[in-house]
Amino acid sequence: METAFSHPPQSSSSKRKVIAVVGGGLVGSLNACFLAKRGFDVEVYESREDIRQAKVVKGRSINLALSHRGRQALKHVGMEDKIISKGIPMHARMIHNVNGKRSPIPYGKKGQYILSVDRANLNKELLTAAEAYPNTRLNFNHKLHDWSPKTGTMTFIGSDGQKTETQADLIVGCDGAFSAVRKQFLRQSRFNYSQTYIPHGYMELTMPPKDGDFAMEPNYLHIWPRNTFMMIALPNLDRTFTCTLFMPFEDFEKIRTGDELLRFFHKYFPDSVPLIGVEALKQDFFRLPAQAMVSVKCCPYHLFEKCVLMGDAAHAVVPFYGQGMNAGFEDCLVFDEIMDQFNENLVAVLQEYTRVRVPDDHAIADLAMYNYIEMRAHVNSKYFIFRKYLDNLLHFFMPKTIVPLYTMVTFTRTRYNDAVNRWHWQNKVITRGLWLCGFVSAAGGTYVLVKNSHKLPSISAEQLWTRILALKLF
């Protein structure tokens, strides 16, 4: 019996396949490069106008952190060097305390860094790269209205309201968290889907240059952690910083006037006020309402042999691990590797892609949720900082045995799911080791005290307790 996610026999036709990429954003445009490089006829359909010609760029503008996974995908299509040249290295987190003190926390080993890149510029570069292939065509102002999972026929609505039909051998849905392609999946049985909005929104502010240079150290991801909310700042090539305030919606709604805004910032982010500027802060804050963030999970990623989901269409993640774009780019690379493995047999390729990629993408979605708590709360903890240094120290002496989670996720292509499983195992080992060290130290101290008790001055239990309290240990 055939289900929506089983496959009828594939045609043995030798005709080159037509692949439709729905969505001309970051993942869609990179995917077009991968597929065109293989010799497929690629049609890219984007609902918006060409971002390279738009006077005003609509959509999200949160700065992006490009790391190893994304770079490997770009390298595969010859784009890594060009993109890196327009990025700014960030070697560590810079933690800003309320009192103005700054403390760096390195991301990894010396020489390891992530890159701050501009979303719009990256999208433009990838579209231009895709368009350079003679077997690729970009179609803008084409909004997907419906499509058939049986025939691969798609209906688009143009900017003039007219409908057009076209057909493809494979439809690749790269059209974001609110994917129109994915709607067809929802009509099928045995398709699992969930979305979760977090109770926090985000708002972007701009920190201008100071005396023609960066207002803060540029090679850091700056973080102002405040337990239930936080602000971050990433550097831009024009020497500005894009600051993003993440906070519960109800807290945003409490700030209604410029005076309330200034009181809030002077209380929680005092060092940022003179750097952003009072008037600029007010203008940016009240320009637009706080934006929502959603996490999307679904399974499987393919439908018959006609369609596959990638990027946010398959796994939108909240932006707190800096892996949303990197995971989407790795989707393209993994799909390409599986195409090699199965000699471009789409029946086998799509099934394997779902099998391999779903657990990894779900793992990074969960990690992104966890990391929000870490970024806004745990980085203030002395134990957190101690564990970071301990993990890095153990990694230095035992590089193959102990690998920090952030290192596995950001600086390697270890599968996300494997990284999480290994992290849990390492935590158990390290925690038990710390408890053992504590027990041995306590036992050793007790033994020394007992052995030398006759040398100690006589003191009552009440006096001993009073002296302990005086040390303010509790």
From Swiss-Prot:
It is a multi-pass membrane protein. Its EC number is 1.14.13.9. Keywords: FAD, Flavoprotein, Membrane, Mitochondrion, Mitochondrion outer membrane, Monooxygenase, NADP, Oxidoreductase, Pyridine nucleotide biosynthesis, Transmembrane, Transmembrane helix. One of its GO terms (molecular function) is FAD binding. It is found in: Mitochondrion outer membrane. It catalyses: L-kynurenine + NADPH + O2 + H(+) = 3-hydroxy-L-kynurenine + NADP(+) + H2O. One of its GO terms (cellular component) is mitochondrial outer membrane. Its cofactor is FAD. The chain crosses the membrane at residues 393-412, 433-453. Pathway: Cofactor biosynthesis; NAD(+) biosynthesis; quinolinate from L-kynurenine: step 1/3. Catalyzes the hydroxylation of L-kynurenine (L-Kyn) to form 3-hydroxy-L-kynurenine (L-3OHKyn). Required for synthesis of quinolinic acid. This is Kynurenine 3-monooxygenase. It comes from Danio rerio. The gene is kmo.
